[in-house]
Amino acid sequence: MRVALFPGSFDPITWGHIDLVKRASLIFDKVIVLVANNSAKSYLLSDIERYELTFEVIASLGWSRIFVDRYDGIILDYALKNNIGFIVRGVRAFHDFEFEFERYVVNNKLSPSIDIVFLPSSDKYLFVRSDLVKELIKNKNFDLSSFIPDLVQKKLKSKFIDKLS
C-alpha cells in the first residue's frame, strides 16, 4: 500500500490544501493529512482547533482513503514511525519550490527511504494562502468562500469576534 503524508499547519485549511489532498489521493492508496506545529510560526487557532477543523472539513467531503492526524514533532519522525514512504508538498510558485527543494535535500540526507512528491497548485488556488485568509477574515464583510469552506469561515469569524471583544 502506497501511503503519503500531507503535512501542514492548516491555520486554517484552505481550498488550495483540499485540492492538493484530493489530487494526492489519486496517486496514493492512503493520504494522511498531518496537522503539525512549527515553532517558528504564530497561530490564530490552537493545535487542537486546527486538528478538529481540518478533521471536520475532510470528514465532510466523504473521502474514504484520507485521514487526519496531528503531531508535535519532526515530520520525518512521524513518517518513519508510521512506515510512510512519501511526503507530499504543494508548491504555488518558484519561491515555494526553492524553499521545498532545500527541505527535500535535507530530508533526503536524513531519511533517503522517504520520497518527497511536489504537486503544483491548481491555477485557481495559486494565491490562496492561510495567512492571507487570516488577514481578510478580520473584515467580516468579505465573502471568502472561494478561499475556504463555509465551516472554516464561520469558525474564523467567531474566533475573531471573540479575540476583538
Swiss-Prot record:
InterPro entries assigned: Cyt_trans-like, PPAT, Rossmann-like_a/b/a_fold
A Pfam match: CTP_transf_like
A single BP term in Gene Ontology: coenzyme A biosynthetic process
Pathways per UniProt: Cofactor biosynthesis; coenzyme A biosynthesis; CoA from (R)-pantothenate: step 4/5
Oligomer status and interactors: Homohexamer.
Catalytic function, reaction form: (R)-4'-phosphopantetheine + ATP + H(+) = 3'-dephospho-CoA + diphosphate
Binding-site list for substrate: S9, K41, I75, R89
Annotated site location: Transition state stabilizer: H17
The keyword Transferase appears for this protein: yes
Functional summary from the UniProt entry: Reversibly transfers an adenylyl group from ATP to 4'-phosphopantetheine, yielding dephospho-CoA (dPCoA) and pyrophosphate.
Keyword Nucleotidyltransferase tagged: yes
GO terms under cellular component: cytoplasm
Localisation: Cytoplasm
Annotated keywords: ATP-binding, Coenzyme A biosynthesis, Cytoplasm, Magnesium, Nucleotide-binding, Nucleotidyltransferase, Transferase
EC code(s) of this entry: 2.7.7.3
Residues reported to bind ATP: S9, F10, H17, G90, V91, R92, E100, Y125, L126, F127, V128, R129, S130, D131
Family statement: Belongs to the bacterial CoaD family.
Enzyme class label: transferase
Protein name: Phosphopantetheine adenylyltransferase
Cofactor: Mg(2+)
GO-annotated molecular function: ATP binding; pantetheine-phosphate adenylyltransferase activity
